[in-house]
Amino acid sequence: MNDERRSASRKPSTAAIEVTDTISGETIGRVGNLSRTGMLLICHRPLNDNALYQLRFRLPDPFGAQSEIETGVHTMWTEQASTDGYQWSGLRIISISGRSAASLDKWLEHGAG
């Protein structure tokens, strides 16, 4: 996706941040990059285009703790990854609690792990 269409710049994740679909309880992939308004999800289970999902993941903070984030997302696009069995999905965050948003902002501000 062209960066100029994004409302916030994305930060790459250097840690393996596993993402769970809260409805199914299944781990569906990991965070590729993340911003206050969206993320790139590297999926090992395909997501549907133009679909809504409820996701949960834990962000490491600089002090060794982890913050659990729950968010509602909208799939903006999907694309086959170069590795067989994987898909890239561009997700827009459409719902996030104040507490989760504060944790996400802190993670983004402190260098993203």
Could you describe each region identified by the protein language model?
Residues 29-31, 69-79:
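Short beta-strand-centered aromatic/proline hotspots
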Residues 36, 78-84:
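Short, conserved beta-turn/loop elements at beta-strand boundaries and strand-helix junctions
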Residues 42-45, 60:
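Beta-strand-rich interaction surfaces with strong enrichment in secreted/lumenal proteins
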